[in-house]
Structures are given as C-alpha cells and as structure tokens.
C-alpha cells in the first residue's frame, strides 16, 4: 500500500502499479510474486528460488518471520516421533515468506520495500489426522490461525498438541463454517465435496476467498 506517493505513472520493472489513475495512493499489483499468481502450475520451490536470487543482492529482514514461526517450531518438537511431519514442517518453514521484508530496486530518492504479512485465519477441512496435520503445518508456517470443523477428529487431535499450537486453533460447527471469518481455505478429500465447499465459499459476501483443493495425502500446498 502506497500513501502520498507523488507519482502519476509507475516504471515497469521498477515500481508496482495500480492501474489507470491509481499509481499514487492505493493498493498495488506487481512485485516478485505477481507472475506466479497467474500460473496454473509451477515448481514447488519457484518462489524460494526467485527470492534467493534477490536476497543474494540485498539483505533480507526476517525478524518478524522468526516470531511468527514459534508455533510451528512447537509442532516440530511435538512431532519427534513423526519424521515425515517434521520434514514437511521444515520444508514449509523454508518456503514460507510471511514476516519477511525486502528492499526493492527503485529510482534514486525513493525507497520501496516489500513486506509479506500473514492472513488472519485459514479454514482447514480434512477427514483424517494426516491431512489435518499437513494443513496445520502449512498454516502455522505462514503465521495464520487455523479454523477447524468442530468434529471429534479435530477436537481429539487438538488435545494432543502443545499449547503454543492449540492456541492458534479455532473451532466452528460444520453448518456454521460458511458464515465464519476466514481468508483462505485448504481442503483434502473427494472432488464432489470440494465442489460443494467451493460453491458455499463463492456464495459468501465480501472479498473473494481462494480455495486450495487436494487429494488425500498431497502436501504441495501453496504458502504465499
């Protein structure tokens, strides 16, 4: 978000842009993640490779990322007997960019920084513990809260988790989920149920909420 930028046109490749007449104050498009959001598929490490190239030229500020990942670190310690979950949590930690700030190239006399912040809450829907933990690790890696259906599976799992993790989990009855506040959705399960969930999410008023749908056991979640 730019405030009071005395600019009527953005320089392509240097400054983010806001559309016709919107290059001053207001929300912006552009930046290192822009093109990736237009792709239907991509390598899982694509974002990390892009940022690594930039970080080699300019130092990265990751102080906030360290704080955001404390619940994820607690999950990793809890998963001492689950090597696959530990490895996946570490992978998500390395891929997640929430809490990072980078100085972007720009014209003399102007300072442009890119700061990536987490959304507030992510609805996670799964019908088995493995997928619920995959979703949990991904959401904690980016610093968000988890919204779980109030079911026996999720309640029992939450009781096993360390306090630092369970404090980041919220519950709602299944019939109340569409009316709850959440900013994104992660789903594991059958395609028919995914279609129904997408219809419910699309019928909500307000901002468009993205839904990531996966078959059971898949872990190639997009974290940005």
Protein language model features and the residues they cover:
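C-terminal segments
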Residues: 1-125, 129-131, 135-224
